[in-house]
Regions:
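Short amphipathic alpha-helical interface segments
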Residues: 11-21, 98-118
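Conserved segment of winged-helix/HTH DNA-binding domains
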Residues: 19, 60-96, 155-174
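Beta-hairpin "wing" of winged helix-turn-helix
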Residues: 48-57, 64, 144-152
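A short acidic, leucine-rich amphipathic alpha-helix
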Residues: 27-29, 109, 120-127
Length: 174
C-alpha cells in the first residue's frame, strides 16, 4: 500500500477523486496529463489497494474514495490519506511519510523496536539482516520520524504527519 501511495500521479488522482467523484478516466487523464491507458493503470493500482473503488454507469467507469471491501488495516490509511490530501499537505511530504514503510525490512524493524528498544547489535542478533543493512534502514526510519535514538537504543517515535502516524500504529498493532 505504501508503494502505491508513494507516487505523485496516484496522489494527484486521489485528490481529484476526493474533490469530484463524478469524473471518468478520460477526465482524470486530461486533468493530470497522462494518457487514458496510463491513468487507468494508476487507478487500478489504487483500486487493488482498496484506496478507491470503481463504479460503472453504463459504459463509463467512475471512482470514489475508499472501498467497502477494504481490510481493517487499510481503513486508517484511507482516513489518513484523505485527511492529508483534504488539508493540502504537499505530495512530497506524503510520499516521504509513505517511503518510510515501503520496504518489508523497515516494517520488521519498527515491529521489533516496538517490542523492545534495541541497539543495532541487538537488532542484528534478532534478525537476518547485516549491521550495514540495519543501519541503512534505521537511517531512513529516523529521517522520517519513525524511530529515535535515545539511551544507546532505538525507540519507536510518534511520527509527524497523518499518514506516518497511521502507518506506525497499523505496523505496531500487526
Amino acid at each position: 500500500t505504501c508503494r502505491v501511495i508513494a507516487n505523485e500521479n496516484r496522489l494527484h488522482l486521489l485528490q481529484l477523486i476526493l474533490k469530484d467523484p463524478t469524473q471518468c478516466v478520460k477526465d482524470l487523464a486530461a486533468e493530470i496529463g497522462l494518457t487514458p491507458s496510463a491513468t487507468s493503470t494508476q487507478l487500478k493500482r489504487l483500486c487493488d489497494e482498496y484506496l478507491i473503488s470503481a463504479h460503472r454507469t453504463g459504459l463509463t467507469l467512475h471512482y470514489s474514495f475508499g472501498s467497502e471491501y477494504a481490510p481493517p488495516h487499510i481503513l486508517p490509511l484511507q482516513a489518513a490519506s484523505k485527511r492529508s490530501l483534504s488539508v493540502g499537505i504537499p505530495y512530497q511530504s506524503i510520499i516521504r511519510q509513505a517511503t518510510g514503510c515501503t520496504h518489508q525490512r523497515r516494517i520488521e524493524l519498527i515491529q521489533r523496536i516496538a517490542t523492545a528498544p534495541s541497539s543495532i547489535e541487538e537488532l542484528v542478533q534478532k534478525s537476518r539482516m547485516s549491521s550495514s543493512a540495519i543501519a541503512r534502514h534505521i537511517r531512513k526510519l529516523k529521517a522520517r520520524g519513525y524511530v529515535v535514538f535515545k539511551d544507546s537504543r532505538y525507540h519507536n517515535a510518534k511520527p509527524a504527519g497523518h499518514l506516518a502516524s497511521a502507518l506506525s500504529k497499523v505496523i505496531i498493532q500487526a
